[in-house]
Amino acid sequence: MEYSGMKEIVWGVWKERENMNADMKWLDNPEVFKVNQLESHSDHCYYLDYSDMKKEKNPLLQSLNGQWEFAYSKNVMERPVDFYKETFDASGFDKIMVPGHIELAGYDKIRYINTMYPWEGKEYHRGAYSMEATGAEEGMFSEAQYNPVGSYIKYFDLDRSMCGKRIHICFEGVEEAMYLWLNGQFIGYAEDSFTPSEFDLTPYIKEKGNVLAVQVHKMSTAAFLEDQDFFRFFGIFRNVTLKALPDVHLEDVWFKPVLNQDNVSGRVSTSMKVSAPDSQHVTACFILKDREENVLVEKSIQLTKENGHMEGTICADLENVKLWDNHNPYLYHAYVELKAEDGSLAEVIPYDIGFRRIEIIDKVVYLNGKRLIITGVNRHEWNARTGRCIGIEDMKADISCMLRNNINSVRTCHYPDQIPWYYMCDDAGIYVMAETNLESHGSFQKLGAIEPSCNVPGSI
């Protein structure tokens, strides 16, 4: 079965790269930061029907959190090269819990660094293409004497509810560079410690007896950009989840609620990108409800094929809009229903949205036409025992602490937080300044002292 939106983006990639091997030189190359990684998309949940939304566990998701096999190596040269093969004997491996930091499991060393790069004083590194590099970038991480490697293996069977569907895997956070294999086949490579990395496993996954192998490297060229003022860890420190995709699936969605200048009326547009079998005609229905579950909007369109996907946008106007702010964080319940050609429900997507308008007038910030007074804090994801590997209860405790102390805003210093945090802030009425994973002051502190091409983008 061929799918709009999958044939070109996924199947075509696999046909071209099915014999590709993992290359350790990617660690040294700033132009290679992902291989076979799927496109980023919205953070929505999806279900086969409304009844699944009420279940404790979504039948389309399977967590791989828990105990994994593990081996620690000081550098690339000492790593177990063939550990990803199905015939590999991992009896000599240790056990490690995922998610978690490798350092807090008893390996390597815990380090806190502010403005320096972690290799300074030990090895000479300059960013690729800088005039001072003179070839130093060749092998600077793949051949470094100190660049620890964590080799993980997970054995698993696919849940019955997942069988027969397209299967993706999502790593919500891996610090700092990762290689991925399934059943002996190379799947992909990714950098960026604080955003999800998603890969398609469909061509190689089995119902039973799967061997998933992940190799995590503490440093790569991404380290030039991830020079935050914090503890330096590595490993799989956020959730790992298998995702089963229905035949008709919402790949990406953008809800855009707009509050008009009268602060009474509003408009919401919902843009969708859907994958479906090429022969399918798909209808999308947008439903908006208030807190009391009264239906305010219900509109449908037939999606059209655009750029290899099924796409469409639904717009709706509202009157007597209830506003969102920190005093009354009112959220509406939005739903997208995708229906197959015979009218049957193929997938349902719930999402809460709010109406608010932010403006800057004469250097003053206004929210919904009123001056906004911000009482905010910087917040790291942090637990005194588990580091940046935190859970829902840690987030709830932070929200509770902020509300008790009349704090109405938070800055996610210095990286994207786990996705549930943003939902919690919506619910609690917390304004969010969301930072990207970019801090390179290890280069700008030398500004004027060395040749300026050494300064990494983002530092000046």
What are these regions (language model features)?
Residues 68, 184, 240, 332, ...:
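Conserved, mostly hydrophobic/aromatic
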Residues 8, 12-43, 51-55, 60, ...:
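Accessory beta-strand-rich segments of carbohydrate-active enzymes
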Residues 176, 194-198, 202-203, 223-224, ...:
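Active-site mouth of glycoside hydrolases
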Residues 162-165, 205-209, 318-331:
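Short glycine/proline/serine/threonine-rich loop/turn segments at secondary-structure transition edges
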Residues 257-266:
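Short, solvent-exposed loop/linker segments at the N-terminal edge
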Residues 237-253, 355-370:
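Low-complexity, Pro/Ser/Thr- and charge-rich linker/hinge segments at domain boundaries
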Residues 180-182, 265-303, 312:
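Beta-strand-rich binding/interaction modules
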Residues 213-215, 333-337:
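Extracellular recognition modules
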